[in-house]
Amino acid sequence: YPPVKRVTAISFISTSFMLSGIIGQNLSEILSNAYGWRVTYIVLSVLYIILTFVVSKLVPESPYRNPDIKLSRFMSHFKDIFLYKSVIGCFFISLTLLTNFISMYTILNDYIKSHFVHGDLTTTFVVKLLGIIGMILSLFAGRISDKLSVIWVIKIALVAQIISLIGLGITSNIVIITFFSIVFVAGIAFCIPSVISKVGMLAATNRGFFLSVNTFILFLGTAIAPVLSIYLEKLTHYFVAFSILSLIALAALIVSFFIPKGINPDTAK
């Protein structure tokens, strides 16, 4: 893809796995409540088998191959990370995104069903599904980044996350909660492709390596989120839980101000 369309292309990819996160949660809850948790794993296994068959038949092989690549050579690139200090900032932002995304929905699920909101299982399903609106809006990230620059899209998206998390903690109105959840999801959905694009811009060499590391760190957040959620669910006030998540987003916002607007200044010499 040309650079102009790269952010848009990445937006489609990131939207797909965020979409699977929302649909997957709803599907698993429906199956678990109706048939038991074992059926959930059986259904998912069948879906993966079908998906494997579809991918093997319909997805073409990549025309770009390098059989000379060795694992030892790939691992040796880790020392280059410290040459790209701005990329480390992007890695930190990536770590916070899915951590907050999964943690927010875990807390939100409990919050809606609490005595503060008086929602039920159907209400949580609807609120989660409406979050898809925020994901669809992120498909315009490429066009917006062309107008504002990638780093400004990242900053605005992080601000949207902070405001929406605070908003979720101070209201018990289900309509307002739904609105803020959509804004939050949009902030995450805008931020992911923008950060990936920024990593590619900052890494003058070994872009594939740095993008691979960024992807690993991004999904590392999915492992951190359940652990974080356990502690957040023990808090007596939901406002405190949402505030902690907003502080994580605030830390990412502060880091974003140390990331240059253009290419890595260390490699532009």
Model-derived features with residue positions:
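Helix-to-loop junctions at the C-terminal end of transmembrane segments
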Residues: 137-149, 233
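Helix-loop-helix hairpin linking two adjacent transmembrane segments in secondary transporters
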Residues: 9-59
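Juxtamembrane intracellular "pre-TM" segments in multi-pass secondary transporters
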Residues: 60-90
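A late C-terminal transmembrane helix in Major Facilitator Superfamily
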Residues: 201-238
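Intracellular juxtamembrane helix-capping segments at the cytosolic ends
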Residues: 1, 190-203
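Extracytoplasmic gate region of multi-pass secondary transporters
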Residues: 86-128, 132
